[in-house]
């Protein structure tokens, strides 16, 4: 059982807008746009302080379509289609286990692209996703984030089951073993 002694936070974002397109000699088209600038999602995160600088944490996050409430990836096979993990923090860093954003995907805390859980950061590493990472979210993942080492941080992930069991794990080896110092 999880007890909310230290902190539990419910968070999310809703982004939609109205788009209007008018071509010369034609009628205007008015549409509702989902996720115009950011991702529609909600989540719950929590941390339990174990003392001596140690803590356990979790994150459960779901994306959705603002106009109809459906999940944003239409897979229907996950309770939380964005992130779902449990982790441990100590003076040696963080380790997490579960469904986690790929290293170069701009998704989640373990990405080397500088993204946050709220997708508020941009990065100069714009081509790393297409060059190395073949997915945005990885299942069955172990992720490590080092503490600050004189201005440097190490990000590392490993997954033996990125999308589904029918895929060969070796086809994702570069993405899973890629690390970054920075």
PLM regions with names:
Residues 5-20, 29-161, 166-168, 175-180:
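Outer membrane beta-barrel
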């Amino acid at each position: 059982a999880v007890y909310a002694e230290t902190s539990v936070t419910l968070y999310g974002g809703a982004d939609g807008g109205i788009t209007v397109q008018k071509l010369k000699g034609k009628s205007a088209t008015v549409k509702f746009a989902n996720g115009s600038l950011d991702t529609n999602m909600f989540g719950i995160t929590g941390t339990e302080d174990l003392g001596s600088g140690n803590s356990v944490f979790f994150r459960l996050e779901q994306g959705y379509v603002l106009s109809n409430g459906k999940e944003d990836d239409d897979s229907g096979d996950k309770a939380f289609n964005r992130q779902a993990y449990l982790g441990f923090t100590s003076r040696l860093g963080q380790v997490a286990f579960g469904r986690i954003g790929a290293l170069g995907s701009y998704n989640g805390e373990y990405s080397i692209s500088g993204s946050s859980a709220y997708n508020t950061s941009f990065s100069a590493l714009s081509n790393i996703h297409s060059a190395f990472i073949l997915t945005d979210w990885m299942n069955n993942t172990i992720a490590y984030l080092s503490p600050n080492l004189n201005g440097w941080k190490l990000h590392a992930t490993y997954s033996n089951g990125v999308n589904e069991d029918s895929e060969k794990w070796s086809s994702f080896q570069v993405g899973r073993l890629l690390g970054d110092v920075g």
